[in-house]
Regions:
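Short basic, glycine-rich beta-strand/loop surfaces that mediate nucleic-acid
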Residues: 1-2, 221
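Conserved short beta-strand edge segments in small beta-sheet-based binding/regulatory domains
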Residues: 2-22
Length: 284
């Protein structure tokens, strides 16, 4: 669980009978010790729902709950309430509102809670024109990657440039666009095959595997294997390559549908800030 009580003051109350528990609206009229929550990688419960055809959030790329999902990235003002986030314009449908209001539900007061009916939708654009949405958008993205295109994917915190790691020519085009001719790139691998694709490319110790699966979804340096399965041009002359697992439900779906490793690097020219706005990516 990511929820931990932080009690700054307590006071015993004698003769008081408590009948229920409520989360009241935040007060903004007085200063207080406010903590900004970080973004969290998608949890196992949400991954299970994401892959369950019987679940109403099946393959919904923005699934989240109180244990996972974006926080810091969504905040426009404090305190951290839905009305102060970029989710404010998405009115909850009756089913999501019921979950949000139910203290026994793991989405109780999960501020970014949403579903395919009431939440953000997935779009695929080319040259500033929307080509497809939702499942068709995901399929179009996978097709573009398989055809050797470099794709900008909007994740939590900003855009990634992604391409087929097994296509050296495409990797070089990505390097040229990013103006990063030699520095190592990182690879993102699917989870659906039990890390089989990962084990074909690198050798991982038990400790490195554990680090890879930790909540931070960090990049782990691993020893490259020799042979035909080794991607070319990823970390020239290093003998090691940075590997990571999908951290968001969108990346989870994309990597699983693609079925192999993708180069994943921030969508900015080396040394410049990460791109977060759609218009900035379209102009770059």
């Amino acid at each position: 669980a990511i929820a931990h009580p932080l009690i700054s003051h307590s006071e015993p109350l004698d003769g008081v009978t408590l009948k229920d528990f409520r989360i009241l609206a935040s007060e903004t009229t007085q200063a207080s010790d406010i903590h900004v929550p970080p973004d969290y990688f998608v949890c196992e419960d949400c991954l299970t729902e994401l892959d369950d055809p019987q679940n109403r959030r099946y393959r919904y790329p923005f699934i989240n709950c109180t244990q996972c999902g974006p926080r810091y990235t969504l905040i426009e003002a404090l305190p951290y309430d839905r009305a102060n986030t970029s989710m404010a314009s998405f009115e909850l449908c009756p089913e999501c509102l019921k979950e949000y209001s139910d203290i026994s539900n793991r989405r109780f007061h999960a501020e970014p809670v949403a579903c395919g009916r009431c939440g953000p939708q997935l779009l695929f654009s080319q040259a500033g024109h929307e080509i497809a949405d939702n499942e068709a958008a995901l399929a179009a993205c996978v097709t573009a990657l398989r055809e050797g295109q470099v794709v900008a994917v909007k994740g939590v915190g900003g855009y990634h440039l992604m391409c087929n790691a097994a296509d050296p020519a495409t990797v070089q085009r990505l390097r040229a666009h990013k103006r990063r001719p030699h520095k190592p790139l990182a690879l993102m691998f699917p989870l659906s095959d039990g890390l089989a694709a990962l084990s074909r490319v690198v050798t991982l110790s038990a400790e490195e595997t554990a680090l890879l699966r930790k909540p931070g979804r960090r990049i782990v340096m691993a020893t490259e294997k020799s042979g035909n399965g080794r991607p070319q041009g990823i970390s020239p002359g290093q003998g090691e390559v940075g590997v990571m697992l999908p951290y968001s439900p969108l990346h989870h779906l994309l990597l699983n549908d693609f079925g192999g490793p993708l180069v994943a690097t921030s969508a900015n020219i080396s040394g410049e800030p990460v791109l977060t706005e759609n218009t900035s990516v379209e102009q770059s």
